[in-house]
Amino acid sequence: MTEYFEVGKILSPHGLKGEVKVNATTDFPEERLANGSRLFIKNSDQYQELIVDGARRHKQFYLVKFEEIDGIDQAEKVCGKELYVAETDQQELPEGSYYFKDILNCPVYDAETGEKLGVLANIETPGANDIWEIKPEHGKSFWIPNIESVVNKVDLANKRIEVTLLEGLRDEN
């Protein structure tokens, strides 16, 4: 069974010819929204394919034309729907890069002591660097920045993340 991953959301129609305004939530908007790209929306429990017929940046959004949508009435019907990419359409990432789905729930260890700190429970992308929520088995969750001085190693093969905690990142109380 094919898995699908969210890459954006259709916000509103734009004009009368079926263009829609899209908030892209992917690190690869130019690739995902390239002419001929396959994206999907979910209707009930089925995924419907949409083929990108054109896209351009507009402020912090993208204006996208899909082959299957040729008027404002059809565009209004897809507003509010998330856009997905099929797992089979995902590109191979460069060395040292990974999809969130591959590292979520990985155990996180202190690189110096080997102590298990918890699991990677959540990832937020607020700005220049992602921040990761580490959820210990007992106690309060804490957040770390995904920067070289903190995240030392991400071993996808062994599902293991090693970090060096800077002073103040973890509330010991």
Swiss-Prot record:
SUPFAM superfamilies per the UniProt record, alphabetical: PRC-barrel domain, Translation proteins
Main location: cytoplasm
Tree of life domain: Bacteria
Compartments, record wording: Cytoplasm
GO BP, one annotated term: ribosomal small subunit biogenesis
GO cellular-component term (any): ribosome
Limits of the PRC barrel domain: 95-169
Keywords associated with the record: Chaperone, Cytoplasm, Ribosome biogenesis, rRNA processing
TM ranges: none
Record GO terms (molecular function): ribosome binding
Gene3D superfamilies linked to this entry: PRC-barrel domain, RimM
Signal peptide segment: none
Listed InterPro entries: PRC_barrel-like_sf (IPR011033), PRC_RimM (IPR056792), RimM (IPR011961), RimM_N (IPR002676), RimM_N_sf (IPR036976), Transl_B-barrel_sf (IPR009000)
Entry function: An accessory protein needed during the final step in the assembly of 30S ribosomal subunit, possibly for assembly of the head region. Essential for efficient processing of 16S rRNA. May be needed both before and after RbfA during the maturation of 16S rRNA. It has affinity for free ribosomal 30S subunits but not for 70S ribosomes.
Subunit and interaction comment: Binds ribosomal protein uS19.
UniProt remark on domains: The PRC barrel domain binds ribosomal protein uS19.
Family: Belongs to the RimM family.
Protein name, per record: Ribosome maturation factor RimM
Gene: rimM
